[in-house]
Amino acid sequence: MELTILGSGCGIPSLEKGAPGHLIVVDNEPLPFDSGSGTLRRLLTAGIDYKQLNHVFYTHTHSDHTSDLIPLIQALRTTPNYHRKDKLTVYGPDGFSDFVKLLAEGFGSWLLEPNYPLEFRDLNKNTLKFKNWTIKTSPVQHSRAAIAYRVESKKGHSICYSGDTDYCTEIIDLAKNVDVLILECSFPDNRKVMGHLTPSYAAEIAARSECKHLILTHLYPPFEEIEAEINSKCPKIFSGKISIAHDFMKLTFES
């Protein structure tokens, strides 16, 4: 099981941090979670051919997390000398399929019916079981509909990704005893914004979930201010390992 942070930023363009995108590989199956602008290119940089993708997961519909969805569907449809036969399944929160239908009104009906099998699945509180991995989802507090994901490998490793969320018991429960918890940490404590986390709130979630490793991402500029708070405040609340995400950060579970 491998985790690669494809984009550690937010909706603000940055030369340092790409838009949100995360890749989990389980038994050679690449599973992307969110695909903000530039994610497809960063997948290629990470060694993943977009034609390998059979499952793509979204936490919510905000553009900094979804803007490469249409380019993916189009690329699989128009790549020369490539005729896809495998189904692509795209997962998102309640209403995600309706969101795509609205996009199709502007981009064209091909978005819903390309020349290969395509399915959109809305999730709420679900458990999806596959041969070598399981995905659990739970609603979190952000936009009208937002979900977090927990990926568990057959070998017992686990990663939880919050997407965008405020402090809520749902993310604590979903992340219980997880190996790696990826949480957004958008703003410093003194500039809390509804629907987002700060260093202290993120650390409290990590402590209550009893995760082993907390990775903080989705920082808004100026990054240095939030990073300073993470380094000074989070260790006082959460005793486990704490990392600040950066693009192409990679973790590997060996066994």
Predicted regions and their residues:
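Cap/insert and terminal regions of metallo-dependent hydrolase folds
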Residues: 167-250
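Adenine-nucleotide cofactor-binding loop residues
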Residues: 36, 141, 166
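Divalent metal-coordination and catalytic microenvironments
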Residues: 3, 22, 34, 43, ...
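Active-site metal-binding motif and surrounding structural segment of the metallo-beta-lactamase
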Residues: 38-89, 179
